[in-house]
Amino acid sequence: MFRGLNPIAVDAKGRIAIPARYREPIESEADGILVVTIDTEERCLLIYTHPQWEQIEQKLENLPSYHPASRRIQRLLIGHATEVELDRSGRILIPPVLREYAGLGSMVMLVGQGKKFELWGKSQWETAREDWLAEELPKGDDLPPELRSLSL
């Protein structure tokens, strides 16, 4: 499981160093191969281990191709999906088109989200986080059923 916030510098070639604590699970589960694609809801990138991405890709391919929303999601997620491999230094190269989409500069935030990572520009992450914290959360009956029983 990937969790936690990780500020990371982007080098001149567009590479980021995956934190050491994640490298062994990525190597053992996916032979060091990750898949990077766009998030269609936020201007960030999604990073999956290769086996995890294959499951998602299969679900995307099973969507009805005659439905415009399904085709749009397939085109965006599968079309932008790029395999990247950890190098000997534990770095991955984020392709320029994906860096541009997410507005990634010299500092990024790698955000663990369980089975995947999100990769945000540092300032975009900080702005989004502050916006989320400032939002008034629904209460009681306005909460989705899945959240009503969640106790933290």
From Swiss-Prot:
Keywords for the protein's UniProt record, in alphabetical order: Cytoplasm, DNA-binding, Repeat, Transcription, Transcription regulation
One MF term in the entry's GO annotations: DNA-binding transcription factor activity
NCBIfam families in the cross-refs: division/cell wall cluster transcriptional repressor MraZ (TIGR00242)
Assembly with partners or alone: Forms oligomers.
Localisation: Cytoplasm, Nucleoid
Pfam families given in the database record: MraZ (PF02381)
One cellular component term from this protein's GO annotations in UniProt: cytoplasm
GO process terms (BP): negative regulation of DNA-templated transcription initiation
Protein family according to the UniProt entry: Belongs to the MraZ family.
PANTHER family according to UniProt: TRANSCRIPTIONAL REGULATOR MRAZ
Entries under CDD domains matching the protein: MraZ_C, MraZ_N
Superkingdom assignment: Bacteria
Segments traversing the membrane: none
InterPro entries: MraZ (IPR003444), MraZ_C (IPR035644), MraZ_dom (IPR020603), MraZ_N (IPR035642), MraZ_sf (IPR038619), SpoVT-AbrB_dom (IPR007159), SpoVT-AbrB_sf (IPR037914)
Residue ranges constituting the SpoVT-AbrB domain according to the UniProt record: 5-52, 81-124
Protein species of origin: Coxiella burnetii (strain RSA 493 / Nine Mile phase I)
Name listed for the protein in its UniProt record: Transcriptional regulator MraZ
